[in-house]
Amino acid sequence: MNAVGRIGSYIYRGVGTVSGPFHPFGGAIDIIVVEQPDGTFKSSPWYVRFGKFQGVLKNGRNLIRIDVNGVDSGFNMYLAHTGQAYFLREVEDVVGESESGEVYTLSSGDEAETTSRDDVVDKVKIPLKSRSCNYDSPSPRTGNGKIVGKPGILGYVFGGRSVRESQDCGVERAEIAADLLEVKWSTNIDTRKRGKGMSSESLDGKDYGESTSTSGKSCVEGSSEMLVDSDSILETPLVASPTLRFLDEKEQDFRESTNVEDYCEEDGSSGVVVENGLCEASSMVFSVTSEGSGNVEIFVEPRTEALAEDAVSGSDLDSKQELLRAPESVEIATLGSADQADMGSIGTSQEGSSTGSPVQDENKITIKDMHISAGDFEKSQSASGESILQPEIEEEQFSFSDLDECKPGGNSSVGSSSSDTVKVDGKESYDETKTSPEKGVENTMALSEPINIERKKDIFTDEMERLVGSLPIMRLQNNDDMDASPSQPLSQSFDPCFNTSKLDLREDESSSGGLDAESVAESSPKLKAFKHVIANPEVVELSLCKHLLSEGMGAEAASQAFNSEKLDMEKFASLGPSILENDKLVVKIGGCYFPWDAAAPIILGVVSFGTAQVFEPKGMIAVDRNEKPGDVLAQGSGSWKLWPFSLRRSTKEAEASPSGDTAEPEEKQEKSSPRPMKKTVRALTPTSEQLASLDLKDGMNSVTFTFSTNIVGTQQVDARIYLWKWNSRIVVSDVDGTITRSDVLGQFMPLVGIDWSQTGVTHLFSAVKENGYQLIFLSARAISQASVTRQFLVNLKQDGKALPDGPVVISPDGLFPSLFREVIRRAPHEFKIACLEEIRGLFPPEHNPFYAGFGNRDTDEISYLKVGIPRGKIFIINPKGEVAVNRRIDTRSYTNLHTLVNRMFPATSSSEPEDFNTWNFWKLPPPSLM
């Protein structure tokens, strides 16, 4: 019974040791910090793990608090989905200067150290978007030779229709704008279901939509980008930045190809003009051809037919398509008719006399040497009749500043000829057009200024308001989903009273309304966030949480930290005026966090003048997490935000421009200086400044990592930080089989309270420590065994002599990878060599810190020789406790070695040269000459 009781007590003590305060699948490895000759600090990696099941937690709950010697460190770590902790660090990446093509994400474990820049660009590749349409252009994803679009705003509006479909030529409508050849044309979408039998639609506001599309049969094959409609899917080849050429010829097909013989054909009425009691239906036949060279030809044939006076009325008009030219924008629109309810065309609505003859025989506009990028310009062509539309449903009315001088029915005549002006990059080119003087027709250019739209805060965010410069005339609507739609589609209606057609192509680089990608990228993120402060200055809260806040920690984590130390009226009254002297005081103004010294002038301005606009957001704690390039993709959640596109093009897309791009933009790109871009990377080591702020003492320091969740509560892992000088000498010792008697039993026997250590090991290592050497205990065990291993070494005593303290450096891998490497592959030296070389990198290059090594295997000798330990200082012990030096010295034990410590390990303060001391020069055999 006594034997059974003793076994039970051993098991109880072992279980109690295993189920201690540490996480069973987590742990932390001891850290080595080396002070450099210049006073800076270098640190070994901070390997901290809490277990992979933590990956189910949200991003806002991954904050790890660090306490060093019982004092908060002032900075935090973050928990990855793998359960491993990491630091966030901002680095400057100069675009255009990287020649290696590597993006270094300072991580380890299951994550790769480096990733190719091309792979990163592929992951965050963003298709170029139209700047004047409120819909998501799908992000292409290739699968089985088809392009599968990412569901975006169109999927939301059109009821989430599938974007994958077989090659079916029964396409009702085809979207030829925003993503067509990536030409950045403005697209106005009418999402109403159209049937072939429909001849007219009432103008009740629901039909008030614009479309730049075709309704014929279409079947386009090849690699393409999808545009989704309520009834159809169009796949258009991805050809970036072609040259445009507009020609008036007798062509009656709409052809779009890149060496693919597929086309859409359309012939129909494009406009209705009411004048002097007679109605003229102006039809437009057009064709677009894309050649392999990157040129796109648009052939336009205008037709005008006289109609009876009672044949057309204002209510029979299908829709009125109005597009005004905004800075850096180009749009093309037409005036639709009742005869062609299912057609949206690209053309010009022309107004002439009752003779019905075409007003233009030929109108040729050629645009060459034109670099088209995201948001560079929009095409604008406005056409209207004299009928003013009155939508029946409630709409958002937009005010345009240039409509005051517009008079209904006004028609001014110019000379016998007019010219269309094309202005690109500050250059103007004129192409004479042949017009008939008696027709009294002119081509004019109308300007519209940016539209400022005031919206409620609960509908549009501040970022949307900042991006609003100029808006298209557009509407997104689906009759099938109108009743279930949670928000009313955006629309506008007004009569600009333009009686003539216009085509204006401009690139106004100096326009303040343009949304240039570089200008947006260069704008201060703090200034963007501060706009919300200005809009909501009345929201002011106090909290003593400055020590918990850090830049880039995330808005949700910052909110939780703020609320945990938030002050209420009672706390504020109890603290009194002394609260202003508290360094932890943080003021939350309009959702932004300020320390008191930065918030004081803002609050003073709000109280005194009722506004915070007079102050800059200086000193604000930028808690918002910096987005990665992959995060700027517009999410397919069906959001109704005004600008769902990214304004920043990826580097790979810019480099992938075809031959259609001209030499001038390429020269500008080559001459442009590299721009430094800040990005956040993961790191396993803190900065030298952060290490200096810890105020470490020489030798051992305790560190605690704390992670809290509502599900599992507070978890904590402990480790130790050792601060050494740059000229320290290190003695490395293996654990399993070297300090213990065997590899396997040495791990389990101490768990049940049985001493399984080598005789005399504590006395030997203590004597080595007393001579000024630092000890490292190296083991290939898993990180989850860190606490057990550390506790075993601390509790190991022989004849009242304990082991000296030293960092326990073990494998950062999990339990099974470590066991597989050590037991199955029998290659623990792979980890040991990498670990020792990493520690050696903490010291100056001219100083080798490793002095001697103890092990029990030949692989240990290989590891020690690899890092520069001489053979005479490598001690290999066998299971019998016999120590061999260089395999040729008399066999000794740890006890016998203790008597030779002063000769084998002379005091570090001695000035005797290492290569010629009494042990290395006289006791070791001479090297072999063979």
Curated annotation (Swiss-Prot):
SMART domains (alphabetical): LNS2 (SM00775)
Q: Which GO terms describe its molecular function?
A: phosphatidate phosphatase activity
Annotated knockout phenotype = No visible phenotype under normal growth conditions, but the double mutants pah1 and pah2-1 show reduced growth.
Segments of skewed composition (Polar residues): 346-360
Which residue positions does Phosphoserine occur at? 470
**Pfam families per UniProt:** Lipin_mid, Lipin_N, LNS2
The enzyme's first-digit EC class, named in words, is: hydrolase
Function, as annotated, reads: Magnesium-dependent phosphatidate phosphatase which catalyzes the dephosphorylation of phosphatidate to yield diacylglycerol. Acts redundantly with PAH1 to repress phospholipid biosynthesis at the endoplasmic reticulum (ER). May function indirectly as repressor of multiple enzymes involved in phospholipid biosynthesis. Is involved in the pathway of galactolipid synthesis in the ER, which is required for the membrane lipid remodeling, an essential adaptation mechanism to cope with phosphate starvation.
Query: Mind telling me what this protein is named?
Result: Phosphatidate phosphatase PAH2
| Organism field | Arabidopsis thaliana
